[in-house]
Structures are given as structure tokens and as C-alpha cells.
Amino acid sequence: MRQYLDLCQRIVNEGCWIENKRTGKRCLTVINADLTYDVANNRFPIITTRKSYWKAAIAEFLGYIRGYDNAADFRKLGAKTWDANANENQVWLNNPHRKGTDDMGRVYGVQGRAWRKPNGETVDQLRKIVNNLSRGIDDRGEILTFLNPGEFDLGCLRPCMYNHTFSLLGDTLYLTSYQRSCDVPLGLNFNQIQVFTFLALMAQITGKKAGQAYHKIVNAHIYEDQLELMRDVQLKREPFPSPKLEINPDIKTLEDLETWVTMDDFNVVGYQCHEPIKYPFSV
């Protein structure tokens, strides 16, 4: 929690104003942020200086694991995070590749589970990683990437957190996640939860011990219409201790994650937080 607040304070103190053409807003921006999450000791990195809707964050990433490409499927899991980008992004609404209401196109999990090869076949990146790690194999290329520049025009949004690299040291599994762009007041807590939970789940289904998760952000920013709430409200609050994440131990395979797992299989224990803060969201 403290490293999150330190990053927020750094942006407020040192950030540079940059105009964002996609949203038409200015962003207070810093370059390069490194965060570390202690998955081994289950120090769940959830925001406590405002209420965090952690179930939606996990639901969204579960949708990526399943390769979903439709906002309606994410809503069924408990995440409304794709409603706006699928249905209110004017560039995407005008895109001839859009298939209709709630269609997201070839983004995130679609790339992770069905990356297109030149011959028309697809690559299931996640399946390969799970298979290798389950056998104790780390080929130094256990990489899940959502970034496919050749298909940017086939999706409603380029991936922000775009790369997840797994590493094995003995029987301990580590994760390094890379993010090109981060809306810190709104998006970062989702991303923190997702990085932490992804490592915890992958360790569980491959029979490994979870180590540390490393989260590397290139462009970390606060939008101009978020700044006052961050500076004058959230940063004035004292954080509470980190809670713990409980995951149903019956989740043992990738197939489990693909089929029957719901948000009822996750629980956060000991979560204390301040009142919610409604930050503006930029499409």
C-alpha cells in the first residue's frame, strides 16, 4: 500500500503535464515506476485509502484467462470494465471490424489464448506456459503477451498491461509484468490485484510455490480531472494494514479456471478501508 501512495505522491510532486490526444485531457505524468508484491507471504496489495472493488479486478483477469472478447461475458463474471471501451469509444464504433454491441475485438485474452500465425493457425500462449511450468520447465521464454501491433485495428483498445513473464527458481515461481500506460487513481489498483492474483493462481495450478511479483510501469499518470481528489483527499488518508487473499484450493488446473471458477472462489480477509472516492474515467 505504501509504495502505491509513494508513486501517487511522486506524480503530484514531480509529474509533467502531457496532453493526451485520445481522451482530449491533460495528464500529470512520470516515467518508470517499479512495484513489488509479496505473494509468498500473501500481502495482498489492495488500496485501503479508498474502497477497492477487488472482485471486479479478479473477474476481469479471469475473463482474459478465458480469452473473452465480449463485454457481456465480462459482466457475467462481475466486471463492467469493458462496457465503455466496447460501446462508447467513437473510433471503435466507427471501425468496420466491430461486430456489434459489446464486441471488444482481438484484445487482451484473445491474443493470449489465440494469437494468429501467418498460416491462419493460432497459438495458445497461456497453455504452453502452464504445461511447461507444471513439468518444472522454464525455457526463459515463459511469456504471455497481449501486445500485437499487427492487430491493433482489430480491437477497441491497445493493451495497457501487455506482458507477463514467469520465471522458475527451483520450485518457486516469480512473475514480472510490464505495463506501457497506467491511470494511477483508477487503473493501478486493479492492475496490482491482477498481477498478485495471476502469480498466486499460476503457482497453485502448476504445483509451485509463489515468490515475488514485479510490476513495471512505463507511463504512470493522473488525469487533470482526478488530481484534486488524489492530492486533497486520498493522499491525506492513513492506510490500513494489508489484508490476505484466499483462493479456493480446489482450483487445480487451467481447465478449472476456464470452466467453473467464479468470484465466490476468492475471498479477502481483514480488509479495512476508507470511504469510496469516485474518480472520473476517461474513454
Curated annotation (Swiss-Prot):
One of its GO terms (molecular function) is thymidylate synthase activity. It is an enzyme of class 2 (transferase). The keyword Cytoplasm applies. It is found in: Cytoplasm. Keywords: Cytoplasm, Methyltransferase, Nucleotide biosynthesis, Transferase. (6R)-5,10-methylene-5,6,7,8-tetrahydrofolate binds at D183, S282. One of its GO terms (biological process) is dTTP biosynthetic process. It catalyses: dUMP + (6R)-5,10-methylene-5,6,7,8-tetrahydrofolate = 7,8-dihydrofolate + dTMP. Pathway: Pyrimidine metabolism; dTTP biosynthesis. DUMP binds at R22, R180, S181, C182, D183, N191, H221, I222, Y223. InterPro entries: Thymidate_synth/dCMP_Mease, Thymidate_synth/dCMP_Mease_dom, Thymidate_synth/dCMP_Mease_sf, Thymidylate_synthase. Belongs to the thymidylate synthase family. Bacterial-type ThyA subfamily. Catalyzes the reductive methylation of 2'-deoxyuridine-5'-monophosphate (dUMP) to 2'-deoxythymidine-5'-monophosphate (dTMP) while utilizing 5,10-methylenetetrahydrofolate (mTHF) as the methyl donor and reductant in the reaction, yielding dihydrofolate (DHF) as a by-product. This enzymatic reaction provides an intracellular de novo source of dTMP, an essential precursor for DNA biosynthesis. Homodimer. This is Thymidylate synthase.
